[in-house]
């Protein structure tokens, strides 16, 4: 038994625990781990050579997969050796093991409820459902909806008999008002980690990425509708979009005074990206320990993948933002057998359905998670109760989803599901191969994207490279091997779910059957960052724990700190370069320079006094003329002027400015014939291939006052 459970000889402490900090207590108390019988510790070895060999082999393997020069065969061989070394280090030499899973609660889930508030809440929700007609939020239906939902939550909520009420705590503080702040090394590490993550997520946010494209114009038009008092439940523009981003951006525009602009979109989505990180920490802590949580928080916070999908200003981070708390509360509810956690999971699940269409697969993930739990021995004595808890979760999520449900039943155009159907079926184009073949191929490509290729979409990725940096990919591989080995040995449902959740959360990308070239994509796989970075953190924590426990105390501490610092530094430097240099250069090379055109038009308007006498002549596959207006500071103005309408500008006596694509010689010839007094200049863009023509027409003589 000791050989099968090696941690009983090496201890579980990683690193030497400081006294529990206020930060940790506020975030979440841990479940007490079972007391471990002390076994005479084995003599510390000089160095855990096999553990470090596994790490070095994994790092070398991933380095060979970095573009442009790749060696797939060598990488497979090195990764195979790394996996074998990790397994031997655990089972053979007992030098390595993942952090142990804490003891799960044994009491069954409660099934009691408060009937009266439940009935009243359901009644209010019925009226709210009717009041949501017309695809509009208003004070009446919102009041009914929120009041009904609050009553249902109260009816299903299980009070904690050991927790004092807010009123009691407030009275106690008023009697003896005092503040107690304890600063420990752990507190300092948490604060520094938060500051580092905020730096990665907000540094140069206004500049990277530096241009908008057509989707941004659509989003800002919807935000303009919100600011104008149009409070839709579902926004049908551009094949339909859920509402959260538009209300969030409107709030940012008003709160920060940024208006209808690219930075308003980016501030909102960057905040959503940060919102997911505390729940990644908490889930890592629930699955492993606080070090797993902190490492997952750091690795995900610095990583290029979640950073770029948060910076681009579209709805992409909404998928992980609400999947992370859903998964955290679901896992905690199953482990602790606490129905309140199921209710919170349902709340975040429902909110996520108002965010990004990829979140529509999360309910399937929740059901599969409960199914995996139900089939394992950890569910003994709790199987019937967990089904009722799942029903409560689904009911709460349905309440939050209620406005969209009303819209779906009322809308006859099928707009809500149109985008998904165009990818899943042959609505827009026939499937290029049998569906099952495409699905298997897509799943494989999505699964290996962490190591090999994250897709070819320049908008939100560095095309053709792995989704993870070298260090994180290697740690993710090692963490996955350790968790898989632990599942084979102990058959704990959580290990299996942690591994299976990754392809499940990638399904919105893999289900692009009609357009397999869109898979993999970092946006539709976004929620997979939650288990991916937790597995990477497990790999790092187990590595450092091995150094601490297998070596003598002082050398072990030094080695653990040094290896951790080196790996995090390597990861941080590469991720910063991926976002701030590689992604930035690639994005700006592909995106059209509407910001430069906007600055030219704004300068013309300020000098000539009339923004309405500047025009952009459209040309196929060139700039979106709506973005020109946004960049010029006139966000609701479309600057397009088609050649057939040139003559209408003769009625304007003032100065005029026409912006043209250099290849559009026909339009230029028409303007020169119409305005022979005009002058042509070439705007020399700072980016290659992005020059444009400026055809300036001076004001008529009578308009100058001469």
Question: Each predicted region: which residue ranges?
Answer:
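Membrane-proximal, lumen/periplasm-facing interface regions of secretory-pathway glyco-
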Residues: 208, 472, 555-643, 686-689
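Transmembrane-lumen/periplasm boundary regions of multi-pass, lipid-linked membrane glycan transferases
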Residues: 212-234, 241-243, 247, 254-258, ...
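Transmembrane-helix signature of polytopic, membrane-embedded enzymes
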Residues: 260-263, 280-302, 495-500, 557-560, ...
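Hydrophobic/aromatic-rich transmembrane helices and adjacent perimembrane loops
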Residues: 309-310, 316, 361, 470-473, ...
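Transmembrane-helix motifs of polytopic, lipid-linked glycan transferases
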Residues: 267-287, 325, 477-484
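Membrane-interface transmembrane helices that cradle and orient dolichyl/undecaprenyl
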Residues: 153-159, 326-344, 352, 377
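Specific aromatic-rich, kink-prone transmembrane helix
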Residues: 298, 318-335, 345-349, 502, ...
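Membrane-embedded, hydrophobic transmembrane alpha-helices
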Residues: 1-186, 344, 365, 369-372, ...
